[in-house]
A protein has these predicted regions:
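Conserved P-loop NTPase nucleotide-binding/switch module
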Residues: 1-38
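A general structural signal for short secondary-structure boundary/capping elements
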Residues: 29, 49-51, 89-95
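Conserved, well-folded catalytic cores of nucleic-acid-processing
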Residues: 17, 21-25, 40-47, 63, ...
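Phosphate-binding/switch region of NTP-binding enzymes
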Residues: 33-67
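Residue-level signal for secondary-structure boundary elements
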Residues: 26, 49, 120-124
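NTP-binding/hydrolysis catalytic cores, primarily Walker-type P-loop NTPases
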Residues: 57-131
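Alpha-helix initiation and N-capping motif
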Residues: 11, 15, 54-57, 105-106
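Structural signal for conserved beta-strand scaffold positions within catalytic alpha/beta enzyme cores
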Residues: 3-4, 46, 62, 78
Length: 131
């Protein structure tokens, strides 16, 4: 498992940011480089500090492919800001919740199983029985 951190403005812009950083060292075609990165880092987690200074996971995506100059991905989870409430004393409190958008792909399920995750853990995460 490879984990890293990168400063970017959104989940899907993280791949473009990785490409920009990689191009400093490697002279490769953009589409080849993006395909390599999507395969190497299929899951991207985007965190952000909100107005009330709390940090939230704003989105989790699964990068699936990069074709014809476009990133193909599925949004797995999003944090939805419902309101910004001003408390006594003038402090702001962000009200929101996480929402599941999509399930991970069958390809990622297979990859996780091949790399050691148990059926039990995967079923707890996906909420469905895995073959």
């Amino acid at each position: 498992t490879v984990c890293t951190t990168i400063h970017s403005n959104s989940c899907n812009s993280t791949y473009r940011r990785m490409m920009t950083l990689a191009k400093r060292k490697y002279n490769m075609d953009d589409s080849v480089l993006m395909q390599i990165m999507v395969e190497a880092y299929p899951v991207v987690v985007f965190t952000k500090q909100l107005e009330d200074r709390s940090r939230k996971i704003m989105e989790i995506i699964e990068g699936e492919d990069y074709l014809d100059g476009k990133l193909l991905y599925r949004s797995l989870y999003k944090y939805e800001v419902v309101d910004n409430v001003t408390l006594e004393g003038g402090e702001t409190h962000v009200v929101g919740h996480h929402r599941k958008m999509c399930s991970i792909s069958d390809g990622l399920i297979k990859r996780l199983l091949d790399n050691g995750i148990s059926h039990k853990e995967l079923e707890e995460f996906t909420g469905k029985v895995v073959d």
